[in-house]
Amino acid sequence: MNIQESIKKRVYEKVVNEIDWENQFSDVKKSCIPPDALVKDLQAVLDRAALPSNKRGKLPMNKAIVHKNSVPQTEEGEVDVKAFIDDITTFPNKLISQNGKMEKTSKGNAWVVNTGIPALRGIVYDEDGGKFYTVNTCPGAGGCALVCYARQGSYVMFDHTSMNLTRRLNLLMNHPEVFEQIIYLELKRFCVEKNKKGVKVLMRWNDAGDFFTKKYWEIARSVTEKLLREGHDFMSYAYTKMGDFMGDLSADIVMNFSREANKQQLSKVDLDNTKASTIVPRDLFRDLFTSTGGGHFKKASDGKPEFNDATGREELKKRLAKEYKVPLSSVIYQEDLPSEEQAPNTFNVIVLPSGDSDEAAQREDVMLIFLLIH
């Protein structure tokens, strides 16, 4: 019996399945979905998938992503709500994974893994209340919602990816204590396995989604502190648009605040003294790289975009320093970060549209991360 199966057996013996809206999740922004509205939404997923790709348009930001293969149907061709409930409330195969960017970051003496939940919106079924809800999983999102990477690419192309994120969210909200125990045990296993080989384990929270509720943040903090107390060579880091979690210095989590957060969250943060990331629009750099058409750039053997000429690298640094009002001497490419961390907030780091790792987000000597939009 694996970890998930063992814990699942114990939880059903001990607890009532219900979302604690009154206490643990009182801060969650949600809306109830009537059964007929859910059926309509799921049928719309099937109808949309039947259209040519150039006719589908973008999915509204207030709708959760559901893959067409995740919409079960009866023999009569109608949406099978019961089967959908069973599917999204099934325990996820795992809470921790490793995407392509984390693989690039895992080198030498570091092993980087990540976890996430649906971006912007997710569907949750209250197992005790018997109701569906749309949950706002990124309540601090501002301009980043328009270009959210976690609502495109593999996150929407593959049904197992989007379904696993949805299952994580449902486990988190229906059984938060179980969620915490599973993710702790998964991380501990990695720590034991990797640490004995001299490899440090790094965990990125919010690969997709955000700390949409204080409870989720508390789980991340609790798991991190427990692993550190046990003496594991481990660290946690995260991107967030939630200003309330940037000032908690006891959390042992390296936080990166997104400057594309909404005004309410921006007002809670001193941007001049906060480690942060910002999305750099294409207009600021597209002419510096070799285009292959269709908005794509020619890539070198390392996967990074090629500059048109030798002056491009320095020109990009100058443009960023001027646009974001930071000293030119502080602007460096991620590949030029020294192997040993320097004093906090020393560098402002360029992360290219492709080929770069997530190292800048993990280091406290990096103040501002320039994320060149994909």
PLM-predicted stretches and their roles:
Residues 2-374:
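Class I S-adenosyl-L-methionine
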